[in-house]
């Protein structure tokens, strides 16, 4: 029998074992589509970003006008910019749903896969932040000023750290230049981390909606899930192009269409929608260092999730009390996102403080207690 090149070629056999002959649980639902959708998001962002970078000038006097020039004079430059800006939103929608799926079905018990995923989230957040500064509009400039200033809360070395990040005594040309360099570099770092993430995932195989061992019922990835993924790509790309063509500025801040002016502070500085939950937690503590620690904890808490798992069952599929808590947490995150977009005044301050407290309480206290209670209920 002739050797099968797909299974014997050094490169093709890696692709084969990851995308073609990969044994996959037969019952995984559409919630398992978001991993591949994130891959498509990354690819789209790198392609549109590369083409935008060809027309961008990383200089404070030219950055804003170079973006305007791209939109007005470059063939389909407006489309590239709209796809890239809204592609970032879709990236975050997909990653939040992907994390939510992992949380709901207990996928975090694949600890290496989960931890590399959290590192990927942090890298994505850093990439989005430095990218938002590049158009050099009002919100770009003041967002960069406010967020980089948070490093000054670090005891003893804080101020030095901020000036080192800025490359001077304020956000200026050196800051923009280095942010552009970082924004170009980080997506490739994300691509590398994704390969590590997949390597760890394929060591254990995918989890499934029942949260039980599925070795006795696996099917090949291709054609079953490759087709399912392609359907996902089509739906997501349709939604992305619809947003980019019909409502390109729906999710962006109008203040960013004004060139950066260090002498005029916007009345209400806020980041893009995907950072608002963390921004609300940061603002809910009336102390700089405390706020920064809470901000860091709001994302880094994900590293603790595997250690807080006390249930005898893996997924939440058959755990109604924990399901209730999960949806409370989701609702709470929506409230935090809304609060982050509001000015710092009554009643938003107290709502933000309550929602921030609830966020940490649900994850650190209520989930483990409820799991223990459900374990007890299994005995009756």
Curated annotation (Swiss-Prot):
What's in the keyword line of the UniProt record? Electron transport, Heme, Iron, Membrane, Metal-binding, Mitochondrion, Mitochondrion inner membrane, Respiratory chain, Transmembrane, Transmembrane helix, Transport, Ubiquinone
Q: Which GO terms describe its cellular component?
A: mitochondrial inner membrane; respiratory chain complex III
Q: What Gene3D superfamilies does the record tag this protein with?
A: Cytochrome Bc1 Complex, Chain C
Chief subcellular site?
Answer: mitochondrion
**Residues engaged in binding heme b b566:** 98, 197
InterPro entries named in the record = Cyt_b/b6_C, Cyt_b/b6_C_sf, Cyt_b/b6_N, Cytb/b6-like_sf, Cytochrome_b, Cytochrome_b_C_euk/bac, Cytochrome_b_N_euk/bac, Di-haem_cyt_TM
The reply on keyword Membrane is yes
Q: Where, by residue number, does the polypeptide cross the bilayer?
A: 34-54, 78-99, 114-134, 179-199, 227-247, 289-309, 321-341, 348-368
GO terms classed as biological process? mitochondrial electron transport, ubiquinol to cytochrome c
Q: Which amino acids does the record list as binding a ubiquinone?
A: 202
**Cofactor(s) this protein requires:** heme b
Q: Where does heme b b562 bind?
A: 84, 183
One GO MF term: ubiquinol-cytochrome-c reductase activity
Subcellular location, record wording: Mitochondrion inner membrane
- Source organism, top-level taxon: Eukaryota
Q: Which Pfam families match?
A: Cytochrom_B_C, Cytochrome_B
How and how many cofactors are bound, per the record note? Binds 2 heme b groups non-covalently.
Write down the membrane topology.
Answer: Multi-pass membrane protein
The remark listed among the other comments is: Heme 1 (or BL or b562) is low-potential and absorbs at about 562 nm, and heme 2 (or BH or b566) is high-potential and absorbs at about 566 nm.
**Function text:** Component of the ubiquinol-cytochrome c reductase complex (complex III or cytochrome b-c1 complex) that is part of the mitochondrial respiratory chain. The b-c1 complex mediates electron transfer from ubiquinol to cytochrome c. Contributes to the generation of a proton gradient across the mitochondrial membrane that is then used for ATP synthesis.
Q: Which family does it belong to?
A: Belongs to the cytochrome b family.
Spell out the subunit comment: The cytochrome bc1 complex contains 11 subunits: 3 respiratory subunits (MT-CYB, CYC1 and UQCRFS1), 2 core proteins (UQCRC1 and UQCRC2) and 6 low-molecular weight proteins (UQCRH/QCR6, UQCRB/QCR7, UQCRQ/QCR8, UQCR10/QCR9, UQCR11/QCR10 and a cleavage product of UQCRFS1). This cytochrome bc1 complex then forms a dimer.
Protein name stated in the entry? Cytochrome b
- What organism does the record attribute this protein to? Trogon curucui
